[in-house]
């Protein structure tokens, strides 16, 4: 039978997945979509009054203390070279979006297969011996399936914090600090120092680039476009049709029969509706928000069918024909903090083809 007609509409929002916190305050953890800035992790050896390292009695290793705050941190990372667009600073961003697209999008799925069973009781003859009438009751099961993906109009908000590099230039992103590099040990004239095995000796050197430990400034911008955000609407479920009514059967030959039936129907529908909103920011991975709901509806309706039947024996045969049914429509909503969407499922004026095996008791 033909698939249910559906339409999708609504608005929503995609919140930022990170919290950069306040624009002021030193040595705080701030997380962004394209990096993070953490409290300074630099330490210095604890010395006694004579300048010698103090040994921790529990670990039997030199004791270290955090250095005195100097407005910088060695613990941070960034993702893309684009974040260095302002000379002398690193820009960190967090993104959010508000979907403001009010377009109603229609979807007419293709026909889907299903299962149908019916029983009939002979009630007698009409117009002589060629026309008989029966009472028929049946049940069918069909899928509900509709999916659509589209870019939507949205208002994109970007919160950007700028951190000073103090005249340094970091390696190309992605880069994470603290960082180290391995260098050869050299003597006073620049020659490599070799070990007893003849292998050049190496040493680990701190190459960390220090960054300001709080933003030098914060800028919030908004822009509206039709390409940064896309929505995917998905409806999945099934519906049962219970029907009953009279059927007329005309004997064309000893083996061929034509039937025509009409009557009342009741449709029980169950569906799951999911909306996935996806924001593609200028840098970093996509940000998604998914919301869903379930609905169950009972709808009154009616049906009509016509078919041809060929009897193989007195008890068995094959039939094929057309079916029409109509049971109205219902609306299913997804209503959460971030999504306010609705879909209309229209089960009216549906037609299709039916074929199968008949058996006479």
Language model features with spans:
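Short glycine/proline- and aromatic-enriched beta-strand/turn motifs that initiate or cap beta-hairpins
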Residues: 1-121, 350, 358-360
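Extracellular/periplasm-exposed beta-strand and loop segments of Gram-negative cell-envelope proteins
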Residues: 8-12, 83-110, 144-239, 268-299, ...
């Amino acid at each position: 039978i033909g698939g249910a007609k559906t339409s999708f509409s609504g608005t929503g929002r995609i919140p930022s997945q990170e919290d950069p916190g306040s624009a002021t305050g030193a040595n705080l953890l701030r997380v962004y979509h394209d990096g993070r800035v953490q409290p300074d992790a630099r330490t210095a050896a604890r010395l006694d009054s004579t300048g010698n390292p103090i040994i921790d009695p529990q670990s039997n290793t030199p004791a270290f203390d955090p250095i005195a705050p100097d407005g910088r941190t060695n613990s941070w990372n960034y993702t893309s070279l684009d974040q260095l667009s302002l000379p002398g600073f690193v820009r960190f961003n967090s993104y959010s979006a508000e979907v403001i697209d009010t377009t109603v999008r229609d979807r007419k799925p293709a026909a889907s297969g299903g299962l149908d069973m019916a029983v009939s009781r002979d009630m007698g003859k009409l117009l002589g011996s060629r026309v008989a009438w029966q009472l028929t009751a049946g049940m069918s099961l069909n899928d509900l399936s509709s999916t659509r993906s589209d870019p939507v109009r949205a208002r994109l908000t970007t919160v950007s914090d700028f951190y000073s590099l103090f005249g340094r230039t970091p390696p190309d992103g992605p880069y994470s600090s603290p960082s180290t590099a391995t260098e050869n040990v050299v003597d006073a004239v620049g020659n490599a120092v070799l070990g007893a095995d003849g292998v050049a000796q190496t040493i680990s050197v701190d190459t960390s680039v220090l960054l300001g430990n709080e933003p030098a400034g914060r800028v919030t911008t908004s822009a509206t476009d039709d390409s940064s955000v896309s929505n995917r609407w998905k409806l999945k479920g099934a519906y049962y049709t219970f029907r009953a009514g009279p059927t007329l059967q005309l004997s064309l030959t000893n083996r061929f029969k034509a039937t025509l039936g009409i009557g009342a129907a009741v449709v029980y529908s169950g569906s799951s509706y999911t909306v996935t909103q996806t924001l593609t920011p200028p840098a970093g991975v996509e940000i998604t928000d998914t919301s869903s709901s379930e609905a169950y509806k009972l709808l009154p309706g009616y049906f009509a069918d016509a078919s041809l039947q060929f009897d193989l024996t007195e008890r068995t045969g094959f039939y094929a024909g057309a079916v029409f049914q109509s049971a109205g429509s219902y609306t299913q909503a997804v209503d959460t903090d971030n999504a306010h969407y609705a879909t209309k499922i229209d089960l009216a004026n549906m037609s299709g083809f039916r074929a199968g095996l008949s058996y006479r008791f």
